[in-house]
Amino acid sequence: MGKKIVFTGGGTVGHVTLNLILIPKFIKDGWEVHYIGDKNGIEHEQINQSGLDITFHSIATGKLRRYFSWQNMLDVFKVGVGVLQSIAIIAKLRPQALFSKGGFVSVPPVVAARLLKVPVFVHESDLSMGLANKIAYKFATIMYTTFEQSKDLIKTKHIGAVTKVMDCKKSFENTDLTSIKEAFDPNLKTLLFIGGSAGAKVFNDFITQTPELEEKYNVINISGDSSLNRLKKNLYRVDYVTDLYQPLMNLADVVVTRGGSNTIFELVAMKKLHLIIPLGREASRGDQLENAAYFEEKGYALQLPESELNINTLEKQINLLISNSESYEKNMSQSSEIKSQDEFYQLLIDDMAKVTKG
């Protein structure tokens, strides 16, 4: 029987990125790779865009909430259906392991794998677990964590951050990049705004409503909204980038980002000056606020509350970052929190082998 592994995770790009780092390595080593997710979710879109040899299985999924809502009744039913669908899929595949990156879509496959005695490996990126991974922990064989967790969580293994930033930077030049450089003023600093798969609208609206921003800076806006796409003097707006991602990062003097740990650790790995504008508690469980406080305390970045975002506060924080750039870059270069992709892959393979033999 050939080696098989099932991946799951979705809802945001951050719940898919690590999977897409690991999957090519498994494929290269001869594994048959399957993915359980929602056909209407961003995970399906990302898998399709990857062009990798992955079999995608769609299941029903529902959002789990900490508060009362009548929608919970329907969503609990959907989760139950998702568990039954996942049991059928995993029982048929008989994989050696399941790897979960979290998000609500991951709960049914994790539960199903455990019921079928398939080893479950889970990854948690944030300082505090989301509800989906709190549930997943109960069914996990091992949970890998980016940050140190309570010693009471005996199944956790702290590994640090695994990012999509490679150890070497490839030189890259194409027509788009040349045009962008020609549109930019070499005498101005360049800001790159990136909001992730959630929360980009605040940045998009701020840039649209603050024309004076383009007088003070060259502005790159990875917006997630194709209707905003344009290139003009001192401004480049694009909905989504793949090959251009690293070159655009290289162009930026400062990156303005949300508070997701995946993106921030990429910036730390690149030693890129960054300003964090986290999602508040009214729009999230507060994990981005915790992340922002952590990275600021480490001396990697500055933060700015979304409610205080305007041209004056932004300019003040940007100036502080640039005037103290040596200190921030030194702190990032000395970080011991980044784990190489190959190191984590080998650790996962070794742990899977131990569990299988055990």
Swiss-Prot record:
Keywords: Cell cycle, Cell division, Cell membrane, Cell shape, Cell wall biogenesis/degradation, Glycosyltransferase, Membrane, Peptidoglycan synthesis, Transferase. GO terms for biological process: carbohydrate metabolic process; cell division; cell wall organization; lipid glycosylation; peptidoglycan biosynthetic process; regulation of cell shape. The keyword Cell cycle applies. It catalyses: Mur2Ac(oyl-L-Ala-gamma-D-Glu-L-Lys-D-Ala-D-Ala)-di-trans,octa-cis-undecaprenyl diphosphate + UDP-N-acetyl-alpha-D-glucosamine = beta-D-GlcNAc-(1->4)-Mur2Ac(oyl-L-Ala-gamma-D-Glu-L-Lys-D-Ala-D-Ala)-di-trans,octa-cis-undecaprenyl diphosphate + UDP + H(+). InterPro entries: GlcNAc_MurG, Glyco_trans_28_C, GlycoTrans_28_N. It is found in: Cell membrane. The keyword Cell membrane applies. Its main location: membrane. Pathway: Cell wall biogenesis; peptidoglycan biosynthesis. It is a peripheral membrane protein. It is an enzyme of class 2 (transferase). One of its GO terms (molecular function) is undecaprenyldiphospho-muramoylpentapeptide beta-N-acetylglucosaminyltransferase activity. One of its GO terms (cellular component) is plasma membrane. UDP-N-acetyl-alpha-D-glucosamine binds at residues 197, 288. Its EC number is 2.4.1.227. It comes from the Bacteria. Gene3D superfamilies: Glycogen Phosphorylase B (3.40.50.2000). Pfam families: Glyco_tran_28_C, Glyco_transf_28. Belongs to the glycosyltransferase 28 family. MurG subfamily. Cell wall formation. Catalyzes the transfer of a GlcNAc subunit on undecaprenyl-pyrophosphoryl-MurNAc-pentapeptide (lipid intermediate I) to form undecaprenyl-pyrophosphoryl-MurNAc-(pentapeptide)GlcNAc (lipid intermediate II). HAMAP family: MurG. This is UDP-N-acetylglucosamine--N-acetylmuramyl-(pentapeptide) pyrophosphoryl-undecaprenol N-acetylglucosamine transferase. The gene is murG.
